[in-house]
Amino acid sequence: MKSIAERMTIPQLIVYVSKFMFENDLTDIAGGNISARDGDVLYMTPTLAGNQWHWNIDTDDIVSGPVTKIDDLKQDPRFTREGLSHLAIYKAFPYVGAVIHAHPKYINPFVACSKTIPPMLSASMQFGELQYHAEAAHYSQDQAEKIVDVLKSQEERMQKKAAAVLMPRHGIIVASMNLMTALDCVQRMNTNAFTVLAQKWLE
């Protein structure tokens, strides 16, 4: 039996992941963005996919372009607001095949007050304690570079599965070898964040 990724094109898979994330509180209407690389072509969700379409997007809405023509991709009016961070990750780590920026329900309380998230479950130990990038303006090239700085110490994690960076008062960004693994890791991290929060109930 073929896996979900084997049954779909990259644009179809991005649409699937978008809806899965929204329906499972892994992101919200306020934002988030998803991208994937297939050879020399990049694919990204359009800007305001949550705000304007409630993540009910189709393959025709996906922004795409060759890696060799990044400037053209940036000029597309649908270029996602966090696109600079996605592009910086792909440039710094050519083996990365997917990037997800999200606002997961149980990670949000941590990023609201810039608290790191320790691993509590065996499923999340591989990610270590989730850390923040240094302060930077949202959607800026400065932010993109500071995200890359945090990921530089996590290359082994990205090559094996995925690595994450927490974004102050904003959300999380995850880089992985492929999109399904990135999605898997976003959910693991969100479940782990819930587990950390739930410890208070057991005291």
Map each language-model feature to its residues:
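Glycine-rich flexible loops
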Residues: 1-203
